[in-house]
Each structure stands twice: as C-alpha cells, then as structure tokens.
Amino acid sequence: AVVGVVGPNGAGKTTLFRLLTGKEKPDAGAVKLGETVKFSYVDQERSALPAGKNLWEAITDGLDRVMLGKKEVNSRAYVASFNFTGPDQQKPVDSLSGGERNRAHMARMMRDPGNVLLLDEPTNDLDIHTLRALELGLANYAGCCIVISHDRWFLDRLCTHILAFEGESVARYFEGNW
C-alpha cells in the first residue's frame, strides 16, 4: 500500500511522521506500532548522508553488491539508476546540489531494510528522470509507503489510499487517490 498524506501547511503532516518514529512524543494518548514495523525515513532536510564520503560510498556503504529486498544487485548499477553515472559517483557528498542530495537520500533509503517507508515531500528538487526512478522504485517496493506531498500528480500515480488533514484536528482516510 502507498498512503498519500495531504493537507495545508501546519496541519500536522510532518508531526505525524515525527510521532511515528519516536522523534516527538504525543501530547495525549499513545502511539502503538506492530512489533515488526521498521521505518526508513527521509525527512525534508535530507541531512543524513555521511560526511567525508563520496556519493557511491554514502549510498552503498562501499559495497560492490547491495541487497534490494531479497535481490542482490551491482552497487554501481544501482547508483546509476538514480542518474548518478561515471564520475558523478565519486563526488564528495558535501558538494552535492539540493536535487543530487535528494536523489542520494532516495537511493540510500530504498536499499534500507525497513518495511515502511516514510517520505516527507520526496519530489522536491527532483528532475523528471529521478522522479520516474522514484516512482518505479516505490511501485516495486515490497513494504508499505507513507508519502507526504503537495504534488497531486505524483500522488495520483502511486497512492492506494489518502489520509487528508483538513484542519481543526480533522483528518479523513479513504481508499483510492485524488
């Protein structure tokens, strides 16, 4: 399932992710997760790339082969699928542009062994080729995905469910997309 989370700025979409991941505590009540839930989370800041490494090392941990779910693939080919080819894979992560940083986070997160992906505005700073790679990656992902986005076109193409924050602490959940 791919759940799209929509709503106006300040409605609590990012707070929902922070509550799910334990980065924030609820004012009342409790957040209960299943025992097997393991999150892979990319926030809007895209700050988790390891400093002092090149792009390929940051995405693959320097491994020649990486696991994608239960499938083992060549790490250079995997990084290239996010539009990082040849010398781009050797760029220091500290020199990446916003769009490159976003693509690198997506690539790193998609190989993480989590079973629930949390994506906060994943389409920001993406070019059309990377957007398509993200769509294909999510379509083939074996787990669940929860996506916060204002990009209705993206949500229409991927979502099986929508959680719509409507303000004043009202939210609706329904099957289908926009």
Language-model features and meaning:
Residues 1-178:
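ABC ATP-binding cassette signature C-motif
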